[in-house]
């Protein structure tokens, strides 16, 4: 009873297509894809900025202990 079968998935998919229509689903898919692409680009830009910032830092001067 609690199992998800292929027939149940097909019925749900058919209902979604009937409710929203193919054009709306296509638009929604495109918007979702663009959002994921933008998120990945922002993550890569942030990583590149952090790496550049780490490369720009001056290493600390090593001090020797004098007795």
UniProtKB/Swiss-Prot annotation:
Localisation: Cell inner membrane
GO cellular component terms attached to this protein's record: TAT protein transport complex
InterPro entries: TatA/B/E, TatA/E, TatE
Transmembrane segments: 4-21
A molecular function (GO) term: protein transmembrane transporter activity
Similarity section: Belongs to the TatA/E family. TatE subfamily.
Function recorded in the entry: Part of the twin-arginine translocation (Tat) system that transports large folded proteins containing a characteristic twin-arginine motif in their signal peptide across membranes. TatE shares overlapping functions with TatA.
Protein name as catalogued: Probable Sec-independent protein translocase protein TatE
Organism of origin: Enterobacter cloacae subsp. cloacae (strain ATCC 13047 / DSM 30054 / NBRC 13535 / NCTC 10005 / WDCM 00083 / NCDC 279-56)
């Amino acid at each position: 009873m609690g199992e998800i079968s292929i027939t149940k998935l097909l019925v749900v998919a058919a209902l979604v297509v009937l409710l929203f229509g193919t054009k709306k689903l296509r638009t929604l898919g495109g918007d979702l894809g663009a959002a994921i692409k933008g998120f990945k680009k922002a993550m890569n830009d942030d990583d590149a900025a952090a790496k550049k910032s780490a490369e720009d830092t001056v290493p600390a001067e090593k001090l020797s202990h004098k007795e």
